[in-house]
Swiss-Prot record:
It comes from the Eukaryota. It is found in: Cytoplasm, Cytoskeleton, Microtubule organizing center; Cytoplasm, Cytoskeleton, Spindle. Its main location: cytoplasm. GO terms for cellular component: cytoplasm; gamma-tubulin ring complex; interphase microtubule organizing center; spindle. GO terms for biological process: gamma-tubulin complex localization; microtubule nucleation by interphase microtubule organizing center; mitotic spindle assembly. This is Mitotic-spindle organizing protein 1. Belongs to the MOZART1 family. Part of the gamma-tubulin complex. Keywords: Cytoplasm, Cytoskeleton.
């Protein structure tokens, strides 16, 4: 990747991360970059959103179970 392309990619990720924070998605920069890359490779964004939601539900249930133990 040349310098200009790398700079454009960085700026695009910065913008996406700013929007993500504004929308209070709770996604960190690294996770967001992975999700964007998956979308760029043809993964359905709605399916990814469903997976993220399910993983968050599972993590919350696990934490709740651990707190009760």
């Amino acid at each position: 990747m040349d310098r200009t392309a790398a700079q454009n990619a960085r700026e695009s990720l910065d913008l996406a991360f700013s929007i993500s924070n504004f929308l209070q998605t709770g996604l960190d920069r690294h996770t967001l970059s992975i999700l964007i890359a998956l979308c760029e490779h043809g993964v359905n964004p709605e399916a990814l959103a469903a997976v993220v939601k399910e993983l968050r539900r599972e993590a919350a249930a696990l934490h709740q179970h651990q707190d009760q133990s």
